[in-house]
Amino acid sequence: MPRRHDRNCAANADTARGHQNGLAPAGEGANNGRVTRSVAVRPATAADVVALGRLNAVVQELHARTHPTEFCAPDATAAASFFREKLDQPNVLVLLAEEGGRTVGYLYAEEQHREANLFRPRSSVLEIHQICTRSDRRRGGVGRALMTAAEQHAVSWGLDGLRLSTGSFNTDAQQFFASLGYVPYSIRLMRRL
């Protein structure tokens, strides 16, 4: 049986460069004792979409490799187009981290609201969809700077909190988020048929 991303996803293997470009998703890689530099975080612009596409390919490749029936192979060009569209949406936050003018990470999040119902109260959160840091800048404060900036945006938007999910395989990311005060509150299970 073909893997789902082979059958249903637009993919370009040439864009799946991953660690060859010195990139790693949150929770992976090491800083190798490098000196922490000043990290500047700013909202991404249309001029940043190619860099976002390259960084996104790393996150996507990790997930596609780990769960090929659930995640498509990376396509940096398509990801750049995706981010170009997202940047125009008022409920979307895309942040870029830079050190010395070099792109070293990004965060993509979306404001989500739930009305109160019989079972659950009203909720307004910033859902963190993706975060990625260059592997050569891991443990250098990039991820922390991105998450801090996201939290500041959530506060300025009057949201109740931030929410995210991470793959059960990604223990490094889980430890990173725990170090920032994130706690597990839900476990999703799946059975493939």
Regions found by a protein language model. Name each.
Residues 130-133, 139-152, 175-179:
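Conserved acetyl-CoA-binding loop-helix of GNAT-fold acetyltransferases
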Residues 96, 102-111, 127, 132:
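Conserved beta-strand in the GNAT
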Residues 81-96, 127:
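A short helix-loop-beta-strand connector motif used in the catalytic cores of GNAT acetyltransferases and
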Residues 3-5, 17, 21-50:
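Conserved N-terminal entry element of GNAT/NAT acetyltransferase domains
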Residues 144, 156, 168-186:
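Conserved active-site alpha-helix within GNAT-family acetyltransferase domains
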Residues 163-173, 190-193:
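Conserved beta-strand-loop-alpha-helix junction that forms the acyl-donor binding cleft
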Residues 60-82:
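Conserved GNAT-fold acetyl-CoA-binding loop/helix
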Residues 154-165:
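Conserved GNAT acetyl-CoA-binding A-motif
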